[in-house]
Amino acid sequence: MRARSRAALLAAGSCLMLAAAGCGSGSSSSQSVATAPAQISGQLKVYAYEDGFTPGYVKSFKAQYPKVDLQTQAFSSSTSALTKLRTGSVSPDVINTCVDENAAEEVRLGVFQPLDVSKIPNWKYIDPELKKLPGVMSDGKVYVVPVDAGDGGIQYDPAHVSPAPTSWKDLFDPRYKGEASIEDNPVTAIDIGALAIGITDPLHMDSAQLEQVKNFLIAHKSQFRTWWESDTDEEQLYKTGEIWISSGYRDNAFTVTKNGVPNNFVLPKEGQLEWTCGYGISAHAHNLSAAYAMINWYASVVAETYEANTWHYRIANLKARAQLPHKILVLSGNNQKLSHPIPASEPSNYAEWVQVWQDVKSG
């Protein structure tokens, strides 16, 4: 699984380009989700991580928009999703994307169309800090509405890892050689390596610092049993006892524990990696009115509250966040002020990072 200031309306030129697809002027229209939800109908294709359309989650959307035929397709990784989107093997209306993966790249490649936020009433409740993250907007236009977020930290099995880890350096502790894992993601892995060797601002590393991180990760490659690729992959590694400690997320630790294997989560002192995910509308969307309705629903109080209660995600809607019970605030981390949050987003020299990570895995 796994961010997004901006213009309130589309520029007139963009609107002209999208006129055939139903772009509005920013005022209420027949396509506005706030005007006539009962009139919104037709097939709507959503391409997302599996949790983006679990039955309990989308139940309220289906009740609100009974004439919409919701068709869903899941992807397990952002890399495979982007490949399918670029080759045209999938043709969704609404697409799930994450800042720590490839949201900014998808925007650059034209996967998304600019959003008319006047058709997304819940946009005004979205945390302003999340609106600033890469991939949410580009050249003054909004492309992605962030809806959920989470802390990247360390997961561990308390039966095997003691005392509790406090630092990213603990992933490289020789006591856990062969029992550790890091997410197979260039941004995540390189951020962790940088923080472990004392680089405090990994997103702005120069080439010399990147080389330093690469050499460190290669030197410690035998520490790691594997690089985990998906949430399911990581959860299974804990279930089978193949790993004791890993980079991971608060919600993953909750899921592992719920499935019978005690699993704890901590925020390392050097910095916390923050993932943020959201939704955009495909540049080739066929059902714009339903797509806007879906994105507005994803950002709604009811949907956001479900995410916090069910998966213990941080949520983007400030109105929903203010209504959470204290227990859920704590479990989801929505009450926590982070000491050194690091947006898990693509750096400006992302291609160089990708090459470094490839070198680490093949080195």
Model-derived features: where do they sit?
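C-terminal motif of bacterial Sec signal peptides marking the signal peptidase cleavage site
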Residues: L18-G22
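Conserved C-terminal helix/tail region of periplasmic/extracytoplasmic solute-binding proteins
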Residues: L338-G363
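Bacterial signal peptide processing site
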Residues: G24-S27
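Periplasmic-binding protein-like
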Residues: L210-H220, W228, N259-A283
